[in-house]
């Protein structure tokens, strides 16, 4: 018997179950929450089951196993891996004669965003709540390859951080970035409520969205009829 839920609702529900000591025997976990649940002694150490052969992870790479482990103990079995992805309205961009290439720089992305806005009035949706994925990529363009060190942000001054936030300020001021006021009325991180597929006007519509590669099928399903989603 499974009990699926939308992303935010899922973690709220799981937290409630954890507080009541009534977590299910098997649950889906995310890397960003793993340490928190282990620290609260809510997850079983699976290492003995790997060692006695009950769990066969021989075909799982060491790096993937490490992602499921805390302090050398395995607390989860990886169900799959994915990567941050840019989804975009291919139908719109094709009509505007704009091509999205792989491995864009931040400057190239901004150039496309401005061109889309100038030609169509459609804006760009930059991550607000999911900025922990976007910000490291923006910072990497300025030589910062790791967001945090052991004690703090892995920067000596704000110079490396500013460009990642400056694009928001400049974009909102110039009109091509969707403002936080639009997101305030949406469910955070929801595919179905992404401005890429959920909008009422050009002011609330985006030509793109930052998500995870394994959410492509959900985004395609949520897209309005006639909209092709590119990745």
Kindly give the residue locations of the regions a language model identified.
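A ligand-binding cleft/hinge motif common to bilobed small-molecule-binding domains
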Residues: 34-38, 212-227
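Short glycine- and hydrophobic/aromatic-rich loop-to-beta-strand nucleating segment
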Residues: 84-88
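Short, solvent-exposed loop/beta-turn-alpha elements that line the ligand-binding surface or hinge
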Residues: 47-60, 102, 125, 145-166, ...
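Glycine-centered hinge/linker elements that transmit conformational signals in sensory
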Residues: 113-114, 153-190
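Short helices/loops that flank or line small-molecule/ion binding pockets
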Residues: 11-23, 93, 111-115, 188-209
């Amino acid at each position: 018997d499974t009990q699926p839920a939308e992303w935010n609702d899922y973690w709220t529900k799981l937290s409630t179950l954890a507080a009541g000591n009534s977590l299910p025997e098997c649950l889906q976990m995310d890397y960003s929450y793993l340490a928190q649940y282990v620290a609260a002694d809510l997850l079983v150490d699976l290492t003995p089951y790997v060692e006695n052969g009950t769990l066969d992870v021989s075909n799982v790479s060491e790096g993937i196993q490490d992602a499921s482990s805390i302090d050398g103990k395995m607390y989860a079995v990886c169900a799959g891996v994915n990567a941050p992805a840019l989804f975009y309205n291919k139908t719109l961009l094709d009509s505007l004669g704009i091509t999205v290439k792989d491995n864009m720089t931040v400057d190239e992305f901004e150039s496309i965003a401005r061109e889309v806005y100038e030609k169509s009035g459609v804006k760009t949706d930059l991550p607000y709540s999911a900025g922990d994925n976007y910000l490291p990529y923006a910072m990497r363009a300025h030589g910062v390859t790791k967001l945090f060190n052991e004690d703090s942000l892995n920067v000596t001054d704000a110079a490396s951080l500013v460009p990642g936030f400056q694009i928001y300020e400049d974009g909102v001021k110039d009109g091509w970035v969707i403002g936080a006021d639009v997101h305030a009325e949406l469910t955070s991180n929801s595919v179905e409520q992404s401005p890429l597929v959920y909008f009422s006007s050009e002011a609330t519509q985006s030509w793109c969205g930052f998500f995870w590669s394994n959410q492509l099928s959900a985004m395609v399903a949520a897209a309005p009829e006639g909209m092709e989603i590119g990745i």
